Amino acid sequence: MRADVMHYGLWLVVLFGLPVQAASIDVTAEYNPAAYEVGYGKFINTTPCLSESWSGFWCSDTSTVDQSQPLFISITIDRVVKNNNNLIDALTYLAFVGARDVSLVHQNSGKSYPLKFFFTKIGALMSPNIAKEALVNNTDWLDHIDGDCQHSLNTYASPSQVHYLYDIKPENQLAGGKCYHNKFKTTFSSKSTALKKIYLGYKLKAPDPLKMENGVYKGSLVLSIGRNKDLDFGNGTYSDSQLTINFTMKVRHQIKIDFPPGGDKVVLLPPGGWSDWIYRGKNRVPSSLRADLHYRIWFSSKIKVTLSCEYPNGSECFIKNTKDGHLVPIHVYWRDYSLITTTTAGLVFAPSVDGTPAVNADRFFSFKITDSQVLKEMMKRPGGTYKGKVTIIFDATI
């Protein structure tokens, strides 16, 4: 007997679309929900690292999507900074929306699952750098921040430009908020300055893939950019007005199966073996011929188990006498909590009663010949050998 195992991985692709006056960013992630991995696997953010040259803008090729990851948007926001006690004219002003829900829809079944998207960091590139002119301490650095952010040493400055990136306080990542630097010279008013990039950190709270069927899921999220919008960087003229996020998630569950050495061959025996049968009298017809094939299995979602037969017998298989071609029907049973007949049409099995992953589970297939008339015919061929190839296909694509 040969057991074919189909292994599958998971890709998450998040695409930022490009409508009119919209920023565009591509974010990709991969999900390998292997039950044999620690934690059963997670979505991995595989977005190519677009790290800036300045210290503190971070990337990780192995980070899961529930860890903060960066992105930046090239944009132009022309501003005039002035100290008039109006925060939207402050040296820095960064307002952001709270968590947003996205509906991921299976492209075949129409079944949907929730995905949550939220920001963890926010910042910008300002050019020219007017900090030294505006600040009382005569520095190029924007180390100070008030409101719903906190400084985390993620700044870089030169006379021509200043980059700043602040941590959003944990309680505001889901709720939204605003951050600002309004402590500068009371008489200061800039001629003009511009934000050339927006820096953002984000996390995804993905649906539980162990509860998702294989296939492609899609969803989208549109965020507005501008005054009193989802992303607001204060008074100014904005070159882009929205950010469209298109999500595509591919789910393919993995299977791992370990058969014992020699597991590609099984020998069917009567209860107690042939020696016992001979001892009790060869004229007696055995009640059955059977063999069990044990194996270890790891899988996290429903799988389909199908037979393929060298000698088909309807939805089951025959084995064949090598001398005279006598065909004998053999039954193949999947055994976990009960014996279930496996067929060429295939049957769907869950990893457990409650749906939790099967991890290194001990299972077995039982091969049986039980028909008394068939067994009687077989006993008329002493010394004969019956053979047949039965292929068991484990398929996670259901």
What are these model-predicted stretches?
Residues 149-218, 228-238, 351-387, 398:
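Exposed beta-sheet edge/beta-hairpin loop segments within beta-rich domains
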Residues 313-362:
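Outer membrane beta-barrel transmembrane domains
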Residues 95-190:
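A surface-exposed loop-and-adjacent beta-strand signature within N-terminal beta-sandwich domains
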Residues 22-133, 203-329, 366-389, 393-398:
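N-terminal small/polar-rich segments of proteins
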Residues 9-12, 55, 142, 275-278, ...:
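Short linear interaction motif-like sites in intrinsically disordered regions of transcription factors
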Residues 13, 286, 356-360:
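Sterically constrained small-residue positions within well-ordered secondary structures
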Residues 1-22:
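Gram-negative bacterial Sec-dependent N-terminal signal peptides
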Residues 16, 43, 53, 143, ...:
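Processing junctions and N-termini across compartments
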